[in-house]
């Protein structure tokens, strides 16, 4: 027997290790996809209004200032739990009215504070955007954001 590692043994270790880690990567990718589709996404609540709200979110580039579940900019508050912060679980009508009033009141004009631009949303657009924000609150975000205030 040779004192060191032979070429064929090294080749077998390389191919075996490569195959093992490729299969591990494929399994983890499949599991991640399965988890996202079956566990963390609220497909039942994904209505046309929620989809329209997502389009409004994208069209107005809200993600350039806000974040949802940590994705986006950190210039303005995290919005994945804004429905909860406005009391949507206890009083959905008041939460909808409060969110709509807040968005329509922008910009506040307070000196020294970051300002949200004014948006001229129709009632239907506002309702869809709020439906989208409500839907994001229902996603299993694994306790994100870490602070309730976003």
From Swiss-Prot:
Species whose genome carries this gene: Halomonas halodenitrificans (Paracoccus halodenitrificans)
Q: Which UniProt keywords apply?
A: Cell membrane, Electron transport, Heme, Iron, Membrane, Metal-binding, Respiratory chain, Signal-anchor, Transmembrane, Transmembrane helix, Transport
What the entry lists under Pfam families is as follows: Cytochrom_C
Could you tell me which SUPFAM superfamilies the record lists for this protein? Cytochrome c (SSF46626)
Task: Quote the function comment for this protein.
Answer: Component of the anaerobic respiratory chain that transforms nitrate to dinitrogen (denitrification).
Q: What is this protein called?
A: Nitric oxide reductase subunit C
Checking PROSITE patterns in the record gives:
CYTC (PS51007)
* Keyword Transmembrane among record annotations: yes
Subunit architecture? Heterodimer of cytochromes b (large subunit) and c (small subunit).
Q: Where in the cell is it found?
A: Cell membrane
Q: What is its main location?
A: membrane
Against Gene3D superfamilies, the record matches this protein to: Cytochrome c-like domain
């Amino acid at each position: 027997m040779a004192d060191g590692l032979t070429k064929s043994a090294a080749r077998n270790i390389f191919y075996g290790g490569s195959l093992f880690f490729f299969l591990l990567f494929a399994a983890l990718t499949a599991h991640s996809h399965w988890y996202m589709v079956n566990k963390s996404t609220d497909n039942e609540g994904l209505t046309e209004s929620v989809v329209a709200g997502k389009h409004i979110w994208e069209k107005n580039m809200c993600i350039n200032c806000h974040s949802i579940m940590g994705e986006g900019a950190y210039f303005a508050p995290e919005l994945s739990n804004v429905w909860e912060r406005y009391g949507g679980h206890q009083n959905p009508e008041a939460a909808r009215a409060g969110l709509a009033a807040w968005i329509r009141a922008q910009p506040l004009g307070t000196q020294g504070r970051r300002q949200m631009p004014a948006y001229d949303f129709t009632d239907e657009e506002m309702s869809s955007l709020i439906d989208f924000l409500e839907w994001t609150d229902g996603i299993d975000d694994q306790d994100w954001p870490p602070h309730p205030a976003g």
